[in-house]
Amino acid sequence: MLTGTFLFGAASAAGYQARFAAIDLATDEKRAKQLSFVVWGSTIGAVAGPNLMQPAGNFAENIGLPRLVGPYLISATTLALAAVVIALFLKPDPYLLANKSNSLDANTSSTREALSHIYRNPTALFAIAAIAIGHIAMVSVMVMTPVHMAHVDVTLSVIGLVISVHVLGMYAFSPIVGSLSDRLGRVRVIQIGLAILLLSTLISGFAQASDAYTLGVGLFLLGLGWSCTLIAGSALLSESVETSFKASSQGASDLVMNLAGATGGAVAGVIIGTLSYGWLCFAAAVPVALLAISSFKLKSESL
């Protein structure tokens, strides 16, 4: 189980990198919009995936396997299909074409070198901070909301609806977010995303566990704010690093993002266990607010 989960995690990490591949050949005027369409494509899987649980389980039982094997079979099949499609049709490699090279030898750097380069680059550092902090706020509140609602016996169908609305906010409006990022600028859309995240934590933090409507609004805004920080932050990162550090910096950003998410999920459990869901939401708002304040300094220096 541990090995399988590790391999699925590696596949997920590769999938996240697809958004960067989409902008290797993009112009400055359309970079965020093109990235956002890749993120928007996740909406299909996010909506269809949970609905395949039942038929996948039935299929597994029909071929003599445990019911819980079914979702893994579906996941393995779709991942294999994705790999085949990319291998056959993503030619020539957009990264190689963008750098007018047939090899990566002249354009690679290690993750450690990339992190060092980012640390010396305030704009790139802000971009990764926006991605990571948006992710940690989203994950920490999102994973504990079903637990919070279940404590007062809210039905699973209602909880599922709230999470579905959250996923809608995360992915469905990605093209709009990308277009705004191209028109208004990356930093401004990140600021908008941070403001939405702050609003969502306040709405969710003051909501009663039984108030599915208010929690749904809060979780929708949580997803939308995350979308803004991810899309605008990813575009800003790609633009702010040197070509030789671009690929490794993009990988480093996802490493930091997912470590932040894992930390947020772990800490969220401790906070809700010792304090309350409301305090969890307010705690998630703190790094968001601090980054929002620092963003105005960055924006003023870049003008």
Predicted regions and their residues:
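C-terminal membrane-cytosol helix-exit motif in multi-pass small-molecule transporters
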Residues: M53-Q54, A76-K100, S294-K299
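Helix-to-loop junctions at the C-terminal end of transmembrane segments
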Residues: G57, A172-R186, I272
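A late C-terminal transmembrane helix in Major Facilitator Superfamily
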Residues: S244-L275
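Glycine-rich segments within core transmembrane alpha-helices of 12-TM secondary carriers
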Residues: K33-M53, V256-G264
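Cytoplasmic helix-loop-helix junction between adjacent transmembrane helices
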Residues: G4-G41
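Juxtamembrane intracellular "pre-TM" segments in multi-pass secondary transporters
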Residues: K91-I128
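C-terminal ends and interior cores of transmembrane alpha-helices
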Residues: I196-A209
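A membrane-interface helix-boundary motif in multi-pass transporters
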Residues: P55-T77, V270-V288
